[in-house]
Amino acid sequence: MTVVERELSEPWEAVCCEPDGGSEAGVVVLAGSSGRVLRERARILAQQGMSALAIRWFGGPGQPAAIREVPLETFTAAVDYLKARGARRVGVMGTSKGAEAALLTAIRDPRIDVVVGNSPTALVWGGVGPGPDGSFTPYRSSWSWQGEPVPFMPYDDSWWDTAPARPRAIRGLYELSERTFAEHVDAAAIPVEQARADLLLVAGGEDRMWPSMTYTLRLAERRRAAGRTVRLISHGDAGHGLLFPGETAGPASAEFDYGGSEVADTLLGKQAWPHVLSALRGD
């Protein structure tokens, strides 16, 4: 299949990969806190017959420098783009913080037909990175909608006093923060049952960045309690960064321990891939 790539610079840095002639199935592709444009993932989705738009959602021109009150309108604009190119079914595939964004956007934009959440969270978390003054505190929400911050979980910074050496597994930061600020949990919970979109969640049991398997089960419980469907794909030995068929593993991080292994992460990606394609196509 011939794939056409279009580089975009407005309203965000992005690449749109699609079959020659376009497609009625479109998907917005979101990275996590790396801030990268996931070109390789967009390409493999386009090779499967979809219009895949991978965007940079922070750190670019005119965008927040860090993940602090990033407007969810950033992602609805991506839906606009795919709709304008003829997509009749639109999905959003996000990983980690990108999955958080995908879920929150689908709750607010009924045009989104499906969300694929890879290593997701069930809670809205505080921002990642410093504010304009260079300070990490006071914590602000990662997201805003219509100019207002989305309620969020703050972090318990005491965790850093006993943090492991680099590369760090920071899952414990999230687990401690949830216990410390338990009174924030209800307001920060992602009401995924409100999304019209179909939902597919993919998680590894050895995720050391945050407890994505636990979060996946919570999201599923909310959906099912509301009489909504959800599909779960998991692998007990996989970590935070699954690899789909056709993707290459990046270099190991010197800063973070993502858990899992290349073998297990690849197995999870292979296991999930047919379900991902089915969900995005609406099969």
Protein language model regions, located:
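The serine-hydrolase catalytic nucleophile loop
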Residues: 32-44, 57, 213
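Catalytic nucleophile-loop/oxyanion-hole region of alpha/beta-hydrolase
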Residues: 34, 58-91
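Primarily recognizes the serine-hydrolase "nucleophile elbow" in alpha/beta-hydrolase
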Residues: 35-36, 40, 80-154, 171-183
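C-terminal catalytic histidine-bearing segment of alpha/beta-hydrolase fold enzymes
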Residues: 217, 226-283
